[in-house]
Amino acid sequence: MANPIEEILGTAAAIAKGMGITFKEMMGPTVTDDYPDAPPKFEERFRGVHVLQRDVNGMEKCVACFLCAAACPSNCIYIEAAENTDKIRMSGGERYAKVYNIDYNRCIFCGYCVEACPTDAITHGHGFEAASYNTSTLVKRKEDMLVPVPPGAKPPSMADEVPAGAH
């Protein structure tokens, strides 16, 4: 049987050693970020919410080829294509995405859509605050994801489009 005084001294030494480590860590620099007071720093390869890109002329890069939707393993991308006309050109191709939705209830941020896009129209941005109490707000529309028109570029306007049946 061990000496009770040795046991008490051993326990006190272990507690003192643990408290020393604790106080040393308390006085050192913090490892965690001060979010939301300070913006987080992301690596270049961070996969945040999706962004639909425009070219230098302000036209949408998406040509509605559906390759991103086909590559998506969770089927969270929905696209409706429309033809570009002489009066209105929304993209550089024959078609443009009239409707482009991503359902973040299903998206797993795998990046397959970004890899599949031949025109680099869809990319991962650095946005990460997508949490919501309402799941219907997690379906992002094209208008929510498009980058602003570059300065000096004239954006295409849907107001010039001929109404259906008026041909």
Curated annotation (Swiss-Prot):
Disulfide bonds: none
Principal subcellular localization: membrane
InterPro entries from the UniProt entry: 4Fe4S_Fe-S-bd, 4Fe4S_Fe_S_CS, NADH_quinone_OxRdtase_chainI
Protein residues bound to [4Fe-4S] cluster 2: C72, C107, C110, C113
Segments forming domain 4Fe-4S ferredoxin-type: 52-82, 98-127
Cofactor: record remark: Binds 2 [4Fe-4S] clusters per subunit.
Family as reported in the entry's similarity comment: Belongs to the complex I 23 kDa subunit family.
Function (record text): NDH-1 shuttles electrons from NADH, via FMN and iron-sulfur (Fe-S) centers, to quinones in the respiratory chain. The immediate electron acceptor for the enzyme in this species is believed to be ubiquinone. Couples the redox reaction to proton translocation (for every two electrons transferred, four hydrogen ions are translocated across the cytoplasmic membrane), and thus conserves the redox energy in a proton gradient.
HAMAP family given in the database record: NDH1_NuoI
Descriptive protein name: NADH-quinone oxidoreductase subunit I 1
